[in-house]
Each structure stands twice: as structure tokens, then as C-alpha cells.
Amino acid sequence: MLGEMWSFNGRYKILHMTWFAFFLSFVVWFNFPPFATTIAQDFGLDKAQLGTIGLCNVALTVPARIIIGMLLDKYGPRLTYSLLLIYAAVPCLIFATAQSFNQLVLGRLLMGIVGAGFVIGIRMVAEWFPPKDVGTAEGIYGGWGNFGSAFSAFTMVIFGIILAFLPGAFNFGQPESFKILFFPEFNTAILNWRAAIAGTGIIAALYGMLYYFSVSDTPPGKTYHRPKSARGMEVTTKKDFWFLLAMNLPLTLILMVLAWRLQKVNFLNGTGFAIAILALVGLYLFQTYNCWTVNKDLMTGKKRYAPEDRYEFSQVAILELTYIVNFGSELAVVTMLPAFFEGTFSLDKATAGIIASSYAFMNLMSRPGGGLISDKMGSRKWTMVVLTVGMGVGYLLMSSVAGTWPLAIAVLLTMACSFFVQAAEGSTFAIVPLVKRRITGQIAGNVGAYGNVGAVAYLTVLLLLTEASAGANGGEPVMATVNAGFFQVLGITGLIVAFLCAFFLKEPKGSFAEFHEGETEMTATPPIEEEATY
């Protein structure tokens, strides 16, 4: 596969167009952080309000990934991805034209739906690549697409300067200093963050239209397998139904945590908070009803699945936990890493940002590397275990980083830790498409949603540690203690999940097969020469 990867024909065309769709969705999703301080000046926001906007950016991604997974299984990735990219222009324009804090929050809440785009490509890539190559293909899709967040961080300010001549530019009053990567520092007094954010949404919408007319859901002659109903996840045993309901509960609880944070910054009053909690309880009950509707015949004894048609929901649950500790921790660490290096080593903001960017840069190699290792090592289970152990140990080592350490050693440790984190993400989604093919979208949606559960949970832990430290030290938190505790939480939870994987994760059936289950050579993806016209 690696030898043909740079081709733009057949399955490789689909792979490249799909990872770029994911890349654009992440550029749009993360177009706020580069302008955070500028927007704070423009609107007079405090740190709590900025933090709330950041949390809102990931909040609706949790239910969105579930819903997108259902729509994906029913309507196919081509239509679903195209419409999501076109939709991305809406929250971008709302945010870019905002005149109040509440409008900013609304824009970022709606933007969280765009973050669900990752799920769509998982199924698209799985349809075009056989099981033996799916880890590498999904790793390339995830790793290269994920780089959109780093690209946004490096380029949005440049776009804001280039577009300064357009209406809506913010004038600092005096030149502000900016530094991007290793380029020389530059000064500007005018930055058009509104035009830059609106522009990314428009670009995403245009690519959404191009994507629709350039790809297909499956290779020629291959059937797109759909579930009987997309209202809820199908399970194949009665005990798995109750397990499914239990694993759906944290998805609702984490949204309650967000509602609590919104109340703390006065976005919601007491009545609004109570209404939000009741609405979330209603959402969980509605989701439960839909799951019952889909699985009613099974639960009432009218239907039994043949052994070869069953899957174990416990395998989905384990993968959800792995994505909490790998992708969830990545999102949380990316948020705090610049401040960590700045405070620990007394660096300026620009230098700390450059060093912290090494964590995101690793995505280009690490996530595909995790998928490749999973494809080549002969056991997807033990690949997952080893990478998750490495991640846990890496975080525990990072908890001991202090200002007395050589900076180069700290940077190397950060990069090594990020390799295990992102390779574990690649390993997770090397398994996801192999659990139950016809509901791959819903499985990917649930697993992906748990990544956001992890991000919100870990960021909340960091916030609580900071507040506790501030309370114990007369109002000023001791960030060295806070950061050490935070990395210890990441490391310990990672090792716990690695232990669970070692005992409960099973090797997927047909992990390294030439064809998907139920396919033959005639219905599988044809050779690249035959696909060249597609």
C-alpha cells in the first residue's frame, strides 16, 4: 500500500480527498484559538469567558458524533461529508459577525458539530480499503486530517493580516508582536479575525461541493451495507442492550458538566441551568427509547441473531475507553502545553508556542504509524495494549518535568509521549471498522464522542486542580503542582485502560483478511488500474 500511496487514482484518490475534507473541518473547528487574545481585547472578555468559549467549541461534538454516525450509516459518507462541510460556513459566519459574548458562544456551540466530521471518513476509508490495509489507511486519514488544527494555529493570524483591508478589522491601537513557528517576529496594529474565520468557512463549503461530485461511497460493484434502522445502535444480545444504555450515560453527564461551567460564568442563570439539565435528561430518555425501538424484537424474544451475525458490544466499550485516554488527553494537553512550557522554563509566549507545536506536528507521522504497526505486527489487540502502556508511562514521566530539566530533554519527552498518544489513536481506529461492518458509522460515532468526553473531563480536572491550588495558596495557584497532578491523572487513567485492554479486548475476526466479511475477489475493491476512471 505504501508504494502506491502517492497515487491519485482509485482508492488513493478517495483517501486523499477524504483526509483533506477532515483537514478542512479541523481548520474550521480550531480557527478560534489563534485569535483568542485578540477577540478578548475586542469584546473585553475575561479568562473565564474565554475558557467557556473553548469548552463550547467541543461540547456539541459529543452528541453530533452520535447523530452523524447514524446519518452516515443511512445516507452514506459522500452526502454526509459534503453537507457537513457546506454547513461549516454557517457557524463561521455567525462567529465572524458576532457583536456580543452570547453570540460568540452560540457560534462555537454550533461549530462543535463540524468537529464530528472525523467519523464520516472512517467509514468512507473502510469501504475502499481491505482489512489488511485499513489500519494504515485510517491512520493516514486521521493523522493528516488532524493536522488541520496545527495548520490553523500557524496560518490564521497570517490570513487575518492579509485580509486586514476588508471591513471588520480590529485595530489594537498600537502594533502587537506576533511570531509563527521559526519565522521572524513581526508587528501589526490591524488584524481582521472576522474575515479570516468567515473565509475558512466559505472555503470548507466550496470543498464540500467539490467532494460531492468527486467521490462515491463504495468502489464499483460493491454494496454499501446499511443497518435496518439508524435511530439507535443495533446490538445482538440482551445483555449488550443494557451495556449500551450504561455507556450512553457518560455522554449525557459530560454535557451536564458543560452546563455547570456555563452557569459558573453566568451564561446560564439558575432557571436556565435547571432547564438545560432537564433537557439533557430528556435527551438521554429519547436516545434510550430509540435504542429500544431498534432492538425491540431482540428484547421481546421475537428475534435471535445467528452466532456468525453477532458482535460483542464490550469491544465497542473498550474502544470508547481507549479513545478517552488517547484522543481526549491529546485535546486537553494541546490546550495547556504552551502555558506549561512558558511557566516551567520561563519562556516567552512565542517560543513556548513553537515548542508546544511539536506535539501537534507528530500527528503527521504518529497516527499513520499506529495504524501501520497495527497492520504489520500481527495482533491489533497487543498493539493497542503496548501503545497505551507507552502513553501512560510517557504522561507519568511528564509529571516530573521541572524547570531544572534541560529544555531539549523535556521537548524530546513531549514528542515521545505524543507519539504513543497519537499512535494509540491510530490503533483504536484500525479496530473500529472491523467490529460490525453495517454499523461502522455508529460505532465510530460513539468511539469518537468518547474522545470529546475525555477532553471535557480532563480539562475540567485541570480547572478543578487549578482552583484547588489557588484556594490553598491565597488565591495564586502553584502551577507546577497543578501540572504534575494533571499529567499523573492522564498517566494513571492510561495505564488502567491498558490493563483493561489486555484482559478484555479481543482480536477482531478477519483482522488481516484480503477482503471484508461477505466479500469475494469479484466484489472487493478492484486493482488501481481498473479504478483510474473513478
UniProtKB/Swiss-Prot annotation:
Keyword hit for DNA damage: no
Record keywords, A-Z: Cell inner membrane, Cell membrane, Membrane, Nitrate assimilation, Transmembrane, Transmembrane helix, Transport
Disruption phenotype: Mutant can still grow on nitrate, but it has a lower capacity for nitrate utilization, which limits the growth of the cells. Mutant cannot consume nitrite as rapidly as the wild type cells at pH 10.
Localisation: Cell inner membrane
Membrane-spanning ranges: 19-39, 52-72, 79-99, 109-129, 150-170, 195-215, 240-260, 266-286, 382-404, 409-431, 445-465, 485-505
PANTHER family in alphabetical order: HIGH-AFFINITY NITRATE TRANSPORTER 2.3 (PTHR23515)
Family: Belongs to the major facilitator superfamily. Nitrate/nitrite porter (TC 2.A.1.8) family.
Identification of the protein by name: Nitrate/nitrite transporter NrtP
